[in-house]
Amino acid sequence: MRKKISIIGAGFVGSTTAHWLAAKELGDIVLLDFVEGVPQGKALDLYEASPIEGFDVRVTGTNNYADTANSDVIVVTSGAPRKPGMSREDLIKVNADITRACISQAAPLSPNAVIIMVNNPLDAMTYLAAEVSGFPKERVIGQAGVLDAARYRTFIAMEAGVSVEDVQAMLMGGHGDEMVPLPRFSTISGIPVSEFIAPDRLAQIVERTRKGGGEIVNLLKTGSAYYAPAAATAQMVEAVLKDKKRVMPVAAYLTGQYGLNDIYFGVPVILGAGGVEKILELPLNEEEMALLNASAKAVRATLDTLKSL
């Protein structure tokens, strides 16, 4: 029996995620949105590409949550877009209501699903989704670190003049300007990145990574990134559905790891069929821990705002 993936939100990120997933033939796809005609039109358009691109999965669009029943993975991309000059925290009031509505309707219909959150502020919305769904925390995760690490790897490859395929990089922390790229855990085909890039340039790359989402928002003027976020989301879905045991940074629920409790936070995990199968604790130095704690403080402040609504 084919796997089933439901994507809630048929905007740029949602529909592009559907395209990546269809191309990978990971399962039948349901694209849901509250705007009548939009998910149906995008799903039909994508399905009509299947004879050309050669993927054999069904893609359907709907406004009815009943059509998402018995999903193996639920991806939530619904949310207000981020505008120039707007912080992720500005989005919290609007997107909290959207998240509650989506999860309260979708989760009961797919009690065994893994939920992947993609809306902002990411860490707080993932916490809210876990609370509303009542699912085990390991089956509710947030997509942030895979995207942020991809940006980091891209910038390293550009600077070093090497293939992006050979760059491995890790980062941690909240999804936002306080994320913590980790040059000490970044390599090019196993060679420390410091052998290729001078410390001052590496520091600039770290800062560009932190501002990566905002850079694209400022360039586009009327929207935000969607190709890379969708590709990152599809990679996480693939890790779950194929039980790949991928090591990747995701927003996971912490119960004492890194000295943090009752918070969704970007950390390296082993991702498989059960969602987060293990949280990996890296031996961070004093400077890295200070940055991590500062990031956690920012995430906690957003979470406190959420809880006060």
Swiss-Prot record:
GO cellular component terms listed in the entry, alphabetical order: cytoplasm
Coiled-coil parts of chain: none
HAMAP family linked: Malate_dehydrog_3 (MF_00487)
Residues annotated to bind substrate: R82, R88, N120, R151
Family designation: Belongs to the LDH/MDH superfamily. MDH type 3 family.
GO biological process: carboxylic acid metabolic process; tricarboxylic acid cycle
GO terms assigned for molecular function: L-malate dehydrogenase (NAD+) activity
Annotated catalytic residues: H175
Positions bound to NAD(+): G9, A10, G11, F12, V13, G14, D33, N95, V118, N119, N120
Keywords annotated in UniProt: NAD, Oxidoreductase, Tricarboxylic acid cycle
Catalytic activity: (S)-malate + NAD(+) = oxaloacetate + NADH + H(+)
Enzyme Commission identifier(s): 1.1.1.37
Subunit structure: Homotetramer (active enzyme); homodimer and homotrimer at temperatures lower than 55 degrees Celsius (inactive forms).
Enzyme kind, highest EC tier: oxidoreductase
Function of the molecule: Catalyzes the reversible oxidation of malate to oxaloacetate.
Identification of the protein by name: Malate dehydrogenase
